[in-house]
């Protein structure tokens, strides 16, 4: 099912896009897990080998290969810019997905239960959801204006200093929600990469894009968003306010 949805689903979307003559720019979003993880200390660059230990990760590497094939076989001849984007571990308010760190933490907080964690030393490139979205918009504009120059793979991750261990995230979150704690799950767990970072040098140099919010600020915003939701306040207004703050901070950071 994972391969059917991620790989063949992407093929079907790209096949439909190939037949749509009005399209000028397409971004295929995969994940940082598309890279062959070597557990090294450096961030992965866009020209690193695709791979993946598990079906999910390898399926995303496959999507990158599919995207590259469609770009070279079809899209470039039609003058369509087809790029791929690889974001880090995206977090933010309103995420209720299963088996994800931040939602699991908030669910435990709501129940006043300790957070059970399996890999506190795993390092991930955490970033607020608005960060890669802003990068995708910049990339889409560049693709539209100059498809030949920008039709390739791009990383949109945090600054190196915000690639933090899971345990650090838990310590920050429990400090923001007094009375909470976390405990280690000692049972056998599925394989999971211990160290994963993205090199965003290319996006900074060629797109003039860079992250806006630090991880500490992002975690504070997530807790605030969730508390607004728990109090049944206007969550749409909160979302719009957060987007406005991000745009202002991004403009200020780029000047």
Name what the model sees in each region.
Residues 1, 40-44, 97-101, 132-133, ...:
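Short, glycine/charged-enriched secondary-structure capping and boundary segments
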Residues 1-15, 19-25, 34-90, 95-97:
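Catalytic helix-loop patch of NAD(P)-dependent Rossmann-fold dehydrogenases
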Residues 4, 28, 46, 134, ...:
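Phosphate-coordinating loops and pocket residues in cytosolic domains that bind phosphorylated ligands
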Residues 6, 10, 98-102, 136, ...:
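Amphipathic alpha-helical segments in well-structured domains
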Residues 31:
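Residue(s) in the substrate-gating loop at a strand-loop-helix junction
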Residues 109-255:
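C-terminal substrate-binding subdomain of Rossmann-fold SDR/epimerase-dehydratase oxidoreductases
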């Amino acid at each position: 099912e994972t391969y059917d949805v991620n790989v063949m689903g992407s093929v079907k979307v790209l096949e439909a896009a190939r037949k749509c003559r009005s399209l000028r720019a397409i971004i295929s979003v995969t994940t940082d897990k598309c890279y062959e993880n070597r557990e090294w200390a450096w961030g992965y660059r866009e020209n690193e080998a695709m791979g993946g230990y598990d079906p999910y990760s390898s399926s995303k590497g496959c999507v990158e290969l599919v995207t590259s094939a469609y770009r070279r076989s079809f899209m470039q001849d039609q003058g369509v810019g087809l790029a791929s984007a690889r974001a880090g571990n995206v977090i933010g308010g309103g995420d209720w997905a299963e088996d994800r760190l931040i939602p699991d933490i908030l669910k435990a907080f709501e129940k006043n239960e300790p957070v059970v964690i399996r890999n506190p030393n795993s390092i991930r490139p955490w970033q607020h959801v608005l960060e890669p979205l802003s990068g995708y918009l910049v990339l889409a504009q560049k693709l539209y204006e100059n498809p030949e120059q920008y039709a390739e793979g791009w990383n949109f991750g945090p600054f190196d200093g915000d690639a933090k261990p899971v345990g650090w995230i838990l310590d920050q979150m429990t400090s923001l929600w007094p009375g909470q704690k976390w405990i280690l799950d000692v049972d056998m767990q599925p394989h999971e990469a211990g160290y994963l970072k993205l090199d965003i040098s290319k996006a900074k140099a060629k797109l003039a894009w860079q992250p806006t919010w630090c991880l500490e600020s992002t975690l504070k915003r997530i807790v605030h968003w969730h508390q607004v939701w728990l109090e049944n306040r206007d969550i749409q207004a909160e979302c719009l306010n957060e987007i406005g703050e991000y745009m202002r901070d991004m403009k200020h950071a780029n000047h």
